[in-house]
Amino acid sequence: MARVCQVTGKGPMVGNNVSHANNKTKRRFLPNLQSRRFWVESENRWVRLRVTAKAIRTIDKNGIDAVLADLRARGEAV
């Protein structure tokens, strides 16, 4: 399973760990992914999405119906 948000498309980023001596080693910044169930009133069912914390706030703001319509327009099966 990919570490990618289904709503925002956010995935891992690459950066550096930097020590006090300014030595740099590669590291990955992983998105804050949560597996969440959302109740879709119009379809009378639960939808499980793997989303970031930012996407949860987006769903709270715009509504699950608008977000699902956007996902379906992109061709994702939900």
From Swiss-Prot:
It holds the Pfam family Ribosomal_L28. Keywords: Ribonucleoprotein, Ribosomal protein. One of its GO terms (cellular component) is cytosolic large ribosomal subunit. Transmembrane segments: none annotated. One of its GO terms (molecular function) is structural constituent of ribosome. GO terms for biological process: translation. SUPFAM superfamilies: L28p-like. NCBIfam families: L28. Belongs to the bacterial ribosomal protein bL28 family. This is Large ribosomal subunit protein bL28. The gene is rpmB.
